[in-house]
Amino acid sequence: MIKVKICGITSPEDALTAVEAGADALGFVFYKESPRHIFPEEAARIINLLPPFVQAVGLFVNEAPEIVNQVSRNCRLGLVQLHGDETPDYCRKIEQRVMKAFRVRSLTCLDPIADYRMSGCLLDAYSPSFYGGTGKSFNWEIAREAMTRGHRIVLAGGLTPDNVAEAIRQVRPYAVDVSSGVESAPGRKDADKVREFIRNAKEAL
């Protein structure tokens, strides 16, 4: 069954709503420029409330590797999501399992993926100004091509309760990732949208 990650969690209430709705993973944004930024101490308190089989994912953008490793240990993250311009050499310095994000404009954006050793590959829409969380989608044919190349794809970018089922049917990804598509405001989740998104994703195939 498709896995679902709800990203940009900033409160215990939103975390528990997502868990109760069936989320497989929750994302915590440690990038200070993001409207969904959370301090590690706050994230750790929320993560301590999670049941054992819900994975905590920490999102970082061009952060020093030693900081990533320290936050990962302190928060007991299950996965580190690198959403910036991190190189394969950088990724090898991360102690925890890595999911690298690639911002997609064309098929050529898939070429560097083979150079990385990672647990998963997140495909997001390209923006010249933002590292994810834009609410924009991209051509899902590119994501489907990535699947045919044998990559474990986590599909992100412009997903909503209304389009997630079709996205899953077209791409057949390992997982889907949503942030702005289930929000009432940046960093504030809409409980009804969260429930609808997860339900539609889980029932898509």
Curated annotation (Swiss-Prot):
Keyword Isomerase found: yes
Any one GO MF annotation of this record: phosphoribosylanthranilate isomerase activity
Example of a GO biological process term: L-tryptophan biosynthetic process
Catalytic activity: N-(5-phospho-beta-D-ribosyl)anthranilate = 1-(2-carboxyphenylamino)-1-deoxy-D-ribulose 5-phosphate
Enzyme Commission number(s): 5.3.1.24
Keyword Cytoplasm assigned: no
CDD domains reported for this sequence: PRAI (cd00405)
Biological or metabolic pathway of the protein: Amino-acid biosynthesis; L-tryptophan biosynthesis; L-tryptophan from chorismate: step 3/5
Origin superkingdom: Bacteria
Pfam families registered for this protein in UniProt: PRAI (PF00697)
Entry keyword set: Amino-acid biosynthesis, Aromatic amino acid biosynthesis, Isomerase, Tryptophan biosynthesis
Family, as annotated: Belongs to the TrpF family.
Name listed for the protein in its UniProt record: N-(5'-phosphoribosyl)anthranilate isomerase
Protein source organism: Trichlorobacter lovleyi (strain ATCC BAA-1151 / DSM 17278 / SZ)
Gene, per the UniProt record: trpF
